[in-house]
Structure formats: structure tokens, C-alpha cells
């Protein structure tokens, strides 16, 4: 079974909390005073909810009381097809939308969820996670947990996506390790709805997600139970995971993708450090109609090549494609930001300084060329000589490029 390409990471993860629609933004501004009052009030109520959940033993009464109090906090939990819940199944599989998915499911049925990539701590326990010693022996520990004979049995709630999505477009690729614990799992689907703002943001912390949950009027969590799924004869963990992923995606009306948590991390990295195009790049590339981008790039690369003839043309074009600016590319090449193997310069090319000085006269003194190659005795002297030669070459290249642009302007 092959996964479809599906939507890209920009559609699976929301980068902005506030709505883009002007009307919704206006409504949010008008609601803000009420939201702040609700936030303060719910913070005090939330402390009582936490204390009650810690004081009462795990039972139907505790889940009913805490579920009612959470509804006052604006966290509404609903479920469909609860009759399909098989209490003999020890592994529950769900898609992941918010940092509080496990808390919501725990209001509906008893379950435990391990916290991945985090050491045991008070925060881990207070958030309702099961404390594990480490991920190195995670699978073996969970197998022993499921094999225990304690009554009543506590199932595991696992999120094979390992990272939360916006819950609208598609699912991340399911990891195979949750499907190596037992040969039967029970999937469930989780849909989250919230007015005015996004349900979750890709780079937000769980604290900010909690504050936004208390700020908005309500957040509705809809849980739908599916029938248990058994491993087929000779089916590998990866195939089992893929089959369950497609089943969950079909029930949600979404697409199962090949994207992994690493793709989410790369997407967030690109969002935090976008490639900036300097203003000079806009003047270097004339607006359409005009030459094609390849012709423009070749023209700019030729300009840099005339200033720095010892730099390969391919290196110049690659850096220009990133910067879009002749000045910035020259600076990168002179300062060593771009590695390259210098080309052999012919005699005609070596005489360029003299020719350019007579063809493009300047008011300032001619930049002296590097002296004959000598090897200084001390490392300090060699470093100083290198810096002087680099500065001289840099000043010469800048002057030659400026004179050429002035002549083109005339």
C-alpha cells in the first residue's frame, strides 16, 4: 500500500493564531474584554478542577465531575458510537490535534498516555501523562504495562503522528512503534472546533494553548470510536500502521500523507528564518514584461564575473539565485562566505586592473594590487598579510563595479 502525496506542511500546520478575515478580526477585538475576564475567572476555576481530579480516585464519578467542570472552563467533550468501545483492547490509537487530546479522551474512558522526549517531572505528572524513564526502552516498557494483570485494565492512548496538526487537511505518517505493542488496536478519531481563532499553532507551547483555550468562549472535542483493527497474518508493523492511518483518515474525510515530525520541524524552521530578498534585488530584477529569470541571472552573473574573473561562473550563479543582489554576491565571495575553487586567470585577464584604470578613470587613487607572493615567518604576519590582500581586493572590486555601473548609467 502506497501513501498518496497529499497536502504539504503549509496546509497541515497553522502558523497564525488570529483570523485573516477582517470581519472575524473585528469580532475578536470586540470579544477581547469578555475573553480576558473569562480567562482570569477560568484560571481560578482551573485550579479547583486540578485539585478535584487529584483528590478523587479514577472512577465514573470522577470523570463525570471533572468533565462537567471542564465544560465550565470551555472544554466540551463529546463522543459518538461509544457502543463500539471494546474494553478488552489495551491500545487506543488517535490522531493528534492539541496538547490536551489525552486529557479529553481520559474524561470519556480510562487511559494512560506516555510523554515522549521528556523526562519524568512534576509537569509531566500534572498534565496527566504517564511517567516513563526514557524512550530507549519505551516499547518494552509499554508491552510490560499492557501485559500486566491488574484490574481494571488501563489501556494505552497513543498518538502515532507524534506531533499535532490543525486537524483539517491530513494526517502525518503513523510511526510503526505503537503497532508493535499488541496485535489488536482500537482507533478513534478526534475533531476539534473553536470559534474566532485557530485550534492550534505549530510553534506554540502548551501553556499558550491552554491560555487561548480559556480565552475563547468554548472548544468542542468530538471523539468518534471505530471498530478494533487486528493485525493480518504476516503483516509488518509499518503495513499495520499504514492501514490504520488510512482508516482514520477516511473517517475524518482527510488524507494520509508521508509527512513526518521532521517535516514539521523543517517547516517551522523555514517560517522562523525566511529567505530575505534585499531591496537591491528588486531593482536588479526588472518587473515583467522583461527577460526571463534565466537571462536575468546570466546577465547579473556576467557582471560579477567581470569584477571577479577568478570565481567560477557556476558558483556566481548559485549565490545570485540565493541573494538576487550583485553587491551581496560580491561581498560573499570576497569575504569567503561561499567556498569555491579559483579558476586559472590568463594574462589578458591579469591585465584587467591596468585596462580598467585607463578605461574607467576615477577620482580616487588606484588600489594597489597584492604584492608578490611571499611567506611570512610568523603566523601573525601571515594573517595580517592575508587580511591586507583581502581588503585590497575587496576595495578594488567595489570600485570597479561602481565605475562600471556609472558608465552604464551615462
Curated annotation (Swiss-Prot):
The lineage of its organism: Eukaryota, Metazoa, Chordata, Craniata, Vertebrata. It is a peripheral membrane protein. The modification Phosphothreonine is found at residue 367. Changing residue 399 to A: No effect on interaction with UBE2G2. SMART domains: CUE (SM00546). The keyword Signal does not apply. Identified in a complex that contains SEL1L, OS9, FAF2/UBXD8, UBE2J1/UBC6E and AUP1. Interacts with the cytoplasmic tail of ITGA2B, ITGA1, ITGA2, ITGA5, ITGAV and ITGAM. Interacts (via C-terminus) with ubiquitin-conjugating enzyme UBE2G2; the interaction recruits UBE2G2 to lipid droplets. Interacts with ubiquitin ligases AMFR/gp78 and RNF139/TRC8; this promotes interaction of UBE2G2 with AMFR and RNF139. Interacts with apolipoprotein APOB. It is found in: Endoplasmic reticulum membrane; Lipid droplet; Cytoplasmic vesicle, Autophagosome. Changing residue 388 to A: No effect on interaction with UBE2G2. Changing residue 384 to A: No effect on interaction with UBE2G2. Changing residue 42 to I: Abolishes lipid droplet localization. Changing residue 390 to A: Abolishes interaction with UBE2G2. Residues 296-338 form the CUE domain. GO terms for cellular component: autophagosome; cytoplasmic vesicle; endoplasmic reticulum; endoplasmic reticulum membrane; extracellular exosome; lipid droplet; membrane. Residues 255-295, 350-369 are annotated as: Disordered. The modification Phosphoserine is found at residues 5, 288, 292, 363. It comes from Homo sapiens (Human). Changing residue 383 to A: Significantly reduced interaction with UBE2G2. This is Lipid droplet-regulating VLDL assembly factor AUP1. Monoubiquitinated and diubiquitinated. (Microbial infection) Not ubiquitinated following Dengue virus infection. The gene is AUP1.
Amino acid at each position: 500500500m502506497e501513501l498518496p502525496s497529499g497536502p504539504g506542511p503549509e496546509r497541515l500546520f497553522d502558523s497564525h493564531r488570529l483570523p485573516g478575515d477582517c470581519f472575524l478580526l473585528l469580532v475578536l477585538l470586540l470579544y477581547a474584554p469578555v475573553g480576558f475576564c473569562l480567562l482570569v475567572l477560568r484560571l481560578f476555576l482551573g485550579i479547583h478542577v486540578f485539585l478535584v481530579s487529584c483528590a478523587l480516585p479514577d472512577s465514573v464519578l470522577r470523570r463525570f465531575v471533572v468533565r462537567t467542570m471542564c465544560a465550565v472552563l470551555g472544554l466540551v467533550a463529546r463522543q459518538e458510537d461509544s457502543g463500539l468501545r471494546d474494553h478488552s483492547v489495551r491500545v487506543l490509537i488517535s490522531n493528534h490535534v492539541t496538547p490536551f487530546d489525552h486529557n479529553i479522551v481520559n474524561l470519556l474512558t480510562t487511559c494512560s498516555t506516555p510523554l515522549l522526549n521528556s523526562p519524568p517531572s512534576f509537569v509531566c505528572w500534572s498534565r496527566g501523562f504517564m511517567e516513563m524513564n526514557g524512550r530507549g526502552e519505551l516499547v518494552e516498557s509499554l508491552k510490560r504495562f499492557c501485559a500486566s494483570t491488574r484490574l481494571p485494565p488501563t489501556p494505552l492512548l497513543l498518538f502515532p503522528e507524534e506531533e499535532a496538526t490543525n486537524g483539517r487537511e491530513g494526517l502525518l505518517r503513523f510511526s510503526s512503534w505503537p503497532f508493535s505493542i499488541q496485535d489488536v488496536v482500537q482507533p478513534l478519531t478526534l475533531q476539534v472546533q473553536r470559534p474566532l481563532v485557530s485550534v492550534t499553532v505549530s510553534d506554540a507551547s502548551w501553556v499558550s494553548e491552554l491560555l487561548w483555550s480559556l480565552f475563547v468562549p468554548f472548544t468542542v472535542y468530538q471523539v468518534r470510536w471505530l471498530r478494533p483493527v487486528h493485525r493480518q497474518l504476516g503483516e509488518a508493523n509499518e503495513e499495520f500502521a499504514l492501514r490504520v492511518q488510512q482508516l482514520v483518515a477516511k473517517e475524518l474525510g482527510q488524507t494520509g500523507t508521508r509527512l513526518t515530525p521532521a517535516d514539521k520541524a523543517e517547516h517551522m524552521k523555514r517560517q522562523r528564518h525566511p529567505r530575505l530578498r534585499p531591496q537591491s534585488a528588486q531593482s536588479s530584477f526588472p518587473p515583467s514584461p522583461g527577460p526571463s529569470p534565466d537571462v536575468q541571472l546570466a546577465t547579473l552573473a556576467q557582471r560579477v564575473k567581470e569584477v571577479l574573473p577568478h570565481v567560477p561562473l557556476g558558483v556566481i550563479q548559485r549565490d545570485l539565485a540565493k541573494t538576487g543582489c550583485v553587491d551581496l554576491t560580491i561581498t560573499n565571495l570576497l569575504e569567503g562566505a561561499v567556498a569555491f575553487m579559483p579558476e586559472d586567470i590568463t594574462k589578458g585577464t591579469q591585465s584587467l586592473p591596468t585596462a580598467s584604470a585607463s578605461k574607467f578613470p576615477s577620482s580616487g587613487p588606484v588600489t594597489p594590487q597584492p604584492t608578490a607572493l611571499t611567506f611570512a615567518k610568523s603566523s601573525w604576519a601571515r594573517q595580517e598579510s592575508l587580511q591586507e590582500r583581502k581588503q585590497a581586493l575587496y576595495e578594488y572590486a567595489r570600485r570597479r563595479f561602481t565605475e562600471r555601473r556609472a558608465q552604464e548609467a551615462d
